[in-house]
Amino acid sequence: MEYQIIELSKEKWENTLIPIGYTTEEYYNITVEKKADGFVMEMKKQSFTQPVTHTPQEYDFPDRLYEPHWEKACARGIVQDEKLMAVVETAPEEWSNRLRVTELWVDESLRGKGIGHALMETAKEQARREGRRVLMLETQSCNVNAIGFYLHEGFTLIGFDSCCYRNNDLDRKEVRVELGWFLQEKK
């Protein structure tokens, strides 16, 4: 079956819940060690003692389309019978000439069919068309499957925030990880 990616208008899709959740058996353990001459940081994949599940409910359903703080956001996705089945939302970061993927989600029934890749390609094309330096996104150090997908898509680690969600993110093994895909600079 072929799926068509369409523009999702703000008027129709604003505030639509994106039910992002996952179960993981692994995480990237991030350590930061202060040294006399600076810091040493390490991000190394490790296993949980038992699977960990994160649900939208535990975070009070934070992922929605066209949130007010994402100025000039745009969304594209797949809709079947008026139901959202997959989506990518992007928003420009004008001051740094970067484009941020604010949401990426594919319904479980459609995973493994290349839809995530196709959605990411639309974001990459938007970044190229707008002349952005970087396409970037946020995920969590415990979302190993997502990190693997993004690395496969050509993204690389550009940073992390060790207290984005709570003050003990490092201990909880849920650290905000920033990944970026760099566009080729014109010579």
Residues of each region from the PLM?
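Residues that form or flank phosphate/diphosphate-binding pockets in enzymes
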Residues: S96, G114, N145
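Acetyl-CoA-dependent GNAT
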Residues: K10, T16-R98, T102, D107-E108, ...
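C-terminal "cap" of GNAT-fold acetyltransferases
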Residues: E2, R133, Q140-V144, E153-T156, ...
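Generic detector of contiguous secondary-structure segments
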Residues: Y3-T16, R132-I147
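Conserved phosphate-binding and hydrolysis motifs of nucleotide-dependent enzymes
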Residues: E82, A86, G114-G116, G154
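Conserved acetyl-CoA-binding loop-helix of GNAT-fold acetyltransferases
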Residues: E103-V106, G112-R129, G148-H152
